[in-house]
Amino acid sequence: MLMPKRVKYRKQQRGRIKGNATRGNTLTYGEYGLQALEPGWITATQIEAARVAMTRFIKRGGKVWIKIFPDKPVTKKPAETRMGSGKGSPEFWVAVVKPGRVLFEIAGVSEEVAKEALRLAMHKLPIKTKFLKREELGGEDNEG
């Protein structure tokens, strides 16, 4: 399971997710990717479930990159506890995702295989996503 080795503060406030992703919104490593279309929290368990679904489908071919990391702790109070007496203890970790963020990338497989692998991963995630394909000629990726 993904989580930070150590953090400066054990507990964080929830915060708001405003605007679109300005970083991590293009394909960096792979040929195909999965891009978030709406904001949300993705837990470490969901990331792992999506990764397992993809790697099982593509078997030994290809490589998968996980482009998000769960670095935000989410606290929870025990069941049947009265209100008050402080904030609960950290229960799990989430990655905060803005629309436009690339979540996963795949390379070394055909487009059909990549599409199906990312479709399987899509079903494990709590947000709407879309399939991305690297444009070889033209587009924003060519700089220079």
Curated annotation (Swiss-Prot):
Binds 23S rRNA and is also seen to make contacts with the A and possibly P site tRNAs. Part of the 50S ribosomal subunit. The keyword Hydrolase does not apply. One of its GO terms (molecular function) is tRNA binding. Belongs to the universal ribosomal protein uL16 family. It holds the Pfam family Ribosomal_L16. The keyword Ribonucleoprotein applies. NCBIfam families: rplP_bact. This is Large ribosomal subunit protein uL16. Gene3D superfamilies: Ribosomal protein L10e/L16 (3.90.1170.10). InterPro entries: Ribosomal_uL16, Ribosomal_uL16_bact-type, Ribosomal_uL16_CS, Ribosomal_uL16_dom, Ribosomal_uL16_sf. Keywords: Ribonucleoprotein, Ribosomal protein, RNA-binding, rRNA-binding, tRNA-binding. Disulfide bonds: none annotated. One of its GO terms (biological process) is translation. GO terms for cellular component: cytosolic large ribosomal subunit.
